[in-house]
UniProtKB/Swiss-Prot annotation:
Gene Ontology CC terms: cytosolic large ribosomal subunit
Alphabetized HAMAP family for the sequence: Ribosomal_bL35 (MF_00514)
Alphabetized InterPro entries for the sequence: Ribosomal_bL35, Ribosomal_bL35-like, Ribosomal_bL35_CS, Ribosomal_bL35_sf
Keyword Cell division assigned: no
Name recorded for this polypeptide: Large ribosomal subunit protein bL35
Keywords: Ribonucleoprotein, Ribosomal protein
Annotated source species: Clavibacter michiganensis subsp. michiganensis (strain NCPPB 382)
GO terms of molecular function: structural constituent of ribosome
Pfam (any one): Ribosomal_L35p
Source superkingdom: Bacteria
Gene this chain is encoded by: rpmI
Record bears the keyword GTP-binding: no
Gene Ontology biological process terms from the UniProt entry: translation
Family: Belongs to the bacterial ribosomal protein bL35 family.
Alphabetized Gene3D superfamilies for the sequence: 4.10.410.60
Length: 64
């Protein structure tokens, strides 16, 4: 049986922490930034943990 390949799109979008949590980038930081407050942009710029409902699928795509 051949090796399982890591999903290319998933490896670009998700980071796995040392404890095994999967982090993703919050949406909303691509355009129209001039109308958003600096506080809002700071919040949006932080990595967010992936929802538990999506965790199983993401782990499979990442080969974990």
């Amino acid at each position: 049986m051949p090796k399982q390949k890591t999903h290319s799109g998933a490896k670009k979008r998700f980071k796995v922490t040392g404890t095994g949590k999967i982090m993703k980038q919050q949406a909303g930081m691509r355009h129209n930034l001039e109308v958003k407050s600096s506080g809002r942009k700071a919040r949006l710029n932080q990595d967010q943990p992936l929802a538990k409902a999506d965790m199983k699928v993401a782990k499979k795509l990442l080969g974990r």
